[in-house]
From Swiss-Prot:
Protein name (Swiss-Prot/TrEMBL): Uncharacterized protein R402
Biased composition, class Basic residues, residue ranges: 563-572
Residue ranges, compositional bias (Basic and acidic residues): 548-562
Alphabetical keyword list: Virion
Residues in the signal sequence: none
Source domain of life: Viruses
GO CC list: virion component
Length: 798
């Protein structure tokens, strides 16, 4: 997911990895991620990682300006990684970092030894790889429940000791290496364990947490079916705080992947060690069990108040497998039947009717961070307070001075520390994004949420306003000196009592109430996401006018709908001519050619096997003229002209009435009787009499006579009863007229001769060849009940 411009080389593996100078602009990286993921800025494109080519230089750096990372930081606590070696727990040290526009979290964790730095299976490296791989699910909008990484840097402990805020918590030995991991913190962030301690747990809260856990495990399993988290406990799960009226709901964020693995893709050596004894069973449900079983054992006082929540636990945590164990064991799992195990598959749980959808958080807004600029100072001793003065200035409820230094000799396991909102600061601002938000006064009402105590701080909030204004003015003056900063419009300004904060995920982006500035259109590329090539030039994008507030909200509301490109409304010109006139002239020419030379090319008739010419007057039987000559020669050599043979063609109805036909044919004028006799003589083959007549008449199979000058009355009638372009007969065509015409034609041919004087074989051959020389009548939209059509497959219209 990183962009590629400049090259850096890993000497150990001799692998060339392309990196981007943008990686060294930390604040720009953090801003890019926010705009791409939370604002849904379409100026970025995703560049996915090739999982077949996983190597460490793709996931971390070994050379970085630490002054940029530790510019303005604040100690946040020590948190477990889950790694325990010889009884010693390895913890992360957290610092909250205030950037130019957004917040972030710095996590510092020691490697076990120097060799582990380049070991791709080491759990610390596995954590960095996992966060980067799974972040693709977030940027591709599969899930919001994974905390996004920004950069990972390996540093020596001796380099970290030069920063006064950091040195008390690390080992200064030159042979101790640390992983410095910068992750997102756009809103108020804390562990799920701390959330349970600080807030009242409602039914909707419990249901939402369980659903989010199921959904994120499902989304990961779709991409990586062999994924295992192995420690889905509240103290290893981060969460953003979201608010719906007075209810605070956590949006869980998986970020602790030290014990994770993906079989055959990301191997974790720690899982094969003697220090890890967890059974790998039940696929993703084994991870879910850790969370729901913990909640059942530790939130009983809240769960028992809600019967509907108890029903949810009966489904996701059957009574047979409830226990005081942290992990699901094979003994517990085997207590279930195969049907019960099937119902506990992550996919089946996710689709269960007990959950509505992930949209349970759709009407909530993010809670902004309560950290104030005065709480942050540079990490180096030259421009910061002393460690003692800094700790004295911290809120006593926010920092536990008994937290041990995170060293390899530490024996502390799974401490619980708050890294988000300070314990005595529970006030949550309930601001709404409106067009006149900038006109609101600084004394807006706020809704209070408490777990065991309430807090009012109107005076301190007013004092924070002046701090916020001062900080914002400094930020704006700094932004004006850099081309990548954002020009602010009057619509984009927010109330003066809000601190610089950051965006949201999913539908919560619509509110975006914490943003004080809209994002700039950066012309650089991000490590995680790249700019689209379709963007306008860098100069115009940098100097573009400020983003209009209403337009931005409009785009956010319709973000789930694909954008429609503007239609081209001009006239296309070829040379000096308008394209429309050229096409019109070309079409006229084609039409005239088609009138003079009818063709079946590119026509429906050609697809059906019948051309317009064949349907009108021509016959496709190559032996047709020879057969007709043979029939004509049997008429005592009589080769009369059209008038002598047929009389006046226009008066044929007056010359041949039914009585005359009966006299000529020697029997009463009965079509069925006549054709039964002909059929007995073998003159009509196997054709049905009535349908054969209709086919011959409509398809024009009685072509011209042997000589050129002879007129074909059937051809004339076929021109009178034309076929439509789809090959279907005219609806006004009368089958009785077909019968009359054929009898008149046969009578005229005989001119009083008996039928026995004609060669029956010639007529039978003519009728049989013509019946097979044309496609089925059903294909032309006719009746499929014809006996000859019963064995044919009807075409697309019948």
């Amino acid at each position: 997911m990183s962009s590629n411009n400049d090259n850096s080389t890993n000497n150990k593996n001799n692998v060339n990895i392309n990196t981007d100078n943008r990686l060294y602009q930390l604040d720009e990286l953090i801003s890019d991620i926010y705009k791409a993921v939370y604002i849904k800025d379409n100026d970025y494109t995703i560049k996915f990682i090739d999982v077949k080519d996983i190597n460490l230089p793709r996931f971390k750096l070994s050379d970085y300006d630490l002054d940029i990372i530790f510019d303005k930081i604040k100690y946040a606590g020590s948190f477990p990684t889950g790694i325990v070696i010889d009884g010693t727990s390895t913890n992360e040290i957290w610092f909250k970092r205030r950037g130019e526009t957004e917040m972030s979290t710095i996590r510092i964790v020691p490697y076990q030894n120097k060799e582990a730095v380049d070991d791709i299976t080491d759990p610390i490296n596995v954590n960095q790889i996992m966060k980067t791989l799974l972040s693709e699910l977030v940027v591709s909008e599969k899930t919001n429940n994974i905390l996004l990484p920004v950069i990972n840097v390996d540093v020596l402990g001796s380099d970290l000791t030069t920063y006064g805020k950091i040195s008390p918590y690390i080992n200064s030995s030159d042979d101790t290496y640390y992983s410095v991991q910068v992750t997102e913190k756009y809103y108020s962030l804390k562990t799920l364990d701390q959330f349970f301690k600080d807030y009242v747990i409602e039914a909707r809260t419990i249901k939402s947490i369980i659903y989010q856990a199921i959904d994120v495990l499902y989304q990961i399993s779709v991409q990586y079916p062999k994924f295992k988290y192995n420690q889905l406990f509240p103290e290893t799960i981060d969460c953003y705080l979201k608010q719906d009226n007075n209810l605070i709901i956590p949006e869980i964020k998986l970020s602790n992947f030290y014990l994770s693995s993906i079989d055959d893709l990301v191997k974790n050596s720690y899982l094969d060690s003697n220090d890890f004894t967890v059974e790998q069973i039940a696929d993703q449900y084994g991870d879910l069990y850790q969370l729901v079983n913990y909640m059942w054992n530790n939130l009983q006082s809240s769960i028992q108040n809600f019967p509907d929540v108890i029903k949810i636990f009966d489904i996701v945590l059957p009574k047979k497998i409830r226990s005081k164990e942290l992990y699901l064991t094979s003994e517990l799992w085997n207590l279930l039947s195969e049907d019960e195990k099937f119902e506990l598959k992550i996919k089946n749980l996710r689709n269960n009717h007990i959950f509505t959808s992930k949209d349970s958080l759709s009407n909530t807004t993010f809670v902004k961070s309560k950290d104030q600029p005065i709480d942050f100072s540079g990490g180096s001793e030259d421009n910061e307070l002393s460690v003692e003065d800094f700790e004295a200035s911290e809120d006593l409820n926010d920092i536990d001075e008994s937290i041990p230094v995170v060293k390899n000799s530490s024996k502390i396991k799974y401490p619980h520390k708050d890294i988000g909102i300070m314990a005595n600061n529970k006030t949550i601002s309930d601001r709404k994004l409106t067009d006149n938000l900038s006109n609101k006064s600084s004394n807006d009402n706020t809704s209070e949420t408490t777990s065991d105590k309430s807090y009012r701080s109107s005076n301190s909030r007013n004092s924070d306003n002046s701090k916020s204004k001062t900080t914002r003015s400094k930020t704006q003056s700094s932004d004006s000196s850099k081309s990548s900063r954002i020009p602010r419009s009057s619509e984009s300004k927010r109330s003066t009592n809000s601190v610089v904060s950051v965006g949201s995920t999913g539908s919560d982006v619509y509110s975006d109430m914490e943003r004080t500035e809209y994002p700039s259109r950066s012309t650089y590329k991000s490590r995680t996401i790249n700019r689209s090539d379709s963007e306008s030039s860098p100069v115009s994008s940098r100097t573009s006018s400020p983003v209009d507030d209403s337009r931005l909200k409009q785009s956010r509301i319709s973000e789930d709908k694909p954008r429609k490109n503007k239609a081209y409304r001009g006239r296309r010109v070829i040379g000096q001519n308008n394209t429309a006139s050229l096409l019109a002239a070309l079409n006229d020419d084609n039409y005239n050619q088609g009138q003079n030379n009818v063709t079946d090319i590119n026509s429906i008739g050609s697809m059906l096997g019948v051309s317009v010419n064949e349907l009108a007057s021509k016959n496709s039987n190559p032996n047709y003229s020879q057969i007709m000559q043979q029939i004509a020669s049997q008429m005592n050599g009589q080769q009369a002209s059209p008038n002598s043979l047929f009389g006046q063609a226009g008066n044929i109805n007056q010359q041949l009435n039914p009585q005359q036909l009966s006299a000529l044919l020697g029997q009463s004028y009965n079509p069925n009787t006549q054709f039964n006799q002909l059929n007995q003589l073998g003159q009509l083959g196997q054709l049905n009499s009535m349908n054969s007549i209709n086919q011959m008449a409509q398809l024009g199979q009685m072509g011209q006579l042997g000589q050129t000058g002879q007129v074909n009355p059937m051809s004339q009638m076929s021109q009178m009863n034309t076929m439509n372009p789809m090959g279907q007969p005219n609806q006004s065509y009368n089958s009785q007229n077909d019968t009359d015409l054929l009898y008149r034609y046969m009578a005229t041919l005989n001119q009083g001769q008996s039928g026995q004087q004609m060669d029956p074989n010639a007529i039978a051959t003519l009728m049989q060849q013509n019946s097979t020389g044309f496609p089925s009548y059903a294909q032309l939209g006719g009746n499929v009940n014809n006996n000859n059509n019963m064995n044919r497959n009807p075409f697309f219209f019948q």
